[in-house]
Regions:
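Helix-to-loop junctions at the C-terminal end of transmembrane segments
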Residues: 116-130
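Helix-loop boundary and gating motifs at the non-cytosolic
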Residues: 55-59, 63-91
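Loop-to-transmembrane helix entry
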Residues: 82-113, 155-158
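C-terminal ends and interior cores of transmembrane alpha-helices
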Residues: 138-151
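Intracellular juxtamembrane helix-capping segments at the cytosolic ends
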Residues: 169-186
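Short hydrophobic/alpha-helical segments at membrane-entry points of transmembrane helices
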Residues: 55-56, 154-160
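Loop-to-transmembrane helix entry/capping segments in MFS-fold secondary transporters
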Residues: 102, 184-189
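Intracellular loop-helix junctions on the cytosolic face of multi-pass helical membrane proteins
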Residues: 1-69
Length: 189
């Protein structure tokens, strides 16, 4: 149903929204239509990228590692810590405990999503974006660490709410940093 609604919205929008030709757009906005942008390759753009791009890229690189590992190993971690499954056993993934833990991981990911939505509402309240981003990543790191030490399935909600805080910042803040670091016209779109 959701996909059908999305497709209908896209069809409606593309059929109803008419774009101005470039010359008419330039006249309407009092732009010099004769000015041509120089076309540069992506390697040149990377060489001229602001330092913020590289800093954020490095942080994102390591942040995404954490989430890739989480998506891969959460079932086993929750099964071992909360259901007592011996993950070194050859049949660990076929045990009832592992299956129940796998089901519970779905609940934990839902809790993470809720934490992410709530934190996304809080993020704009910070005066410093860098502080908000750093704090979010530290809160998320605390959540990741806590998962190794919690042995109650309901207490696992706490680290996953914290991980959700990091997730909200990882998705929103880098785009803000990089777009604000771009200078001039023609870098976007």
């Amino acid at each position: 149903i959701g996909a059908a609604i999305l497709i209908l919205c896209v069809i409606y929008t593309t059929s109803k929204v008419k774009e101005m030709p470039p010359k008419e757009y330039a006249e309407y906005h009092n732009l010099n239509s004769e000015k041509k942008e120089e076309s540069v390759g992506w390697i040149t753009l990377l060489k001229k990228a602001p330092a913020t791009f590289w800093k954020v890229g490095l942080v994102q690189f390591f942040s995404w590692f954490a989430f890739m590992y989480m998506w891969t190993y959460t079932n086993g971690t929750v099964a071992a810590n909360c259901w007592g499954v011996d993950m070194l056993a050859h049949n660990a993934t076929s045990t009832i405990g592992y299956q129940e833990a796998g089901n519970w991981v779905g609940v934990l990911f839902a809790v993470q999503s809720i934490g992410s939505v709530v934190w996304a509402i809080v993020l704009p309240q910070f005066k410093s974006r860098k502080m908000a981003y750093a704090l979010s990543l530290l809160i998320g790191a605390a959540g990741f660490i806590m998962t190794a030490f919690i042995h109650d399935q309901y207490m696992m909600f706490v680290p996953f709410v914290l991980i959700g805080c990091a997730w909200a910042a990882i998705l929103a803040m880098p785009f803000t940093f990089v777009t604000n670091a771009l200078e001039g016209y023609g870098h976007m779109g």
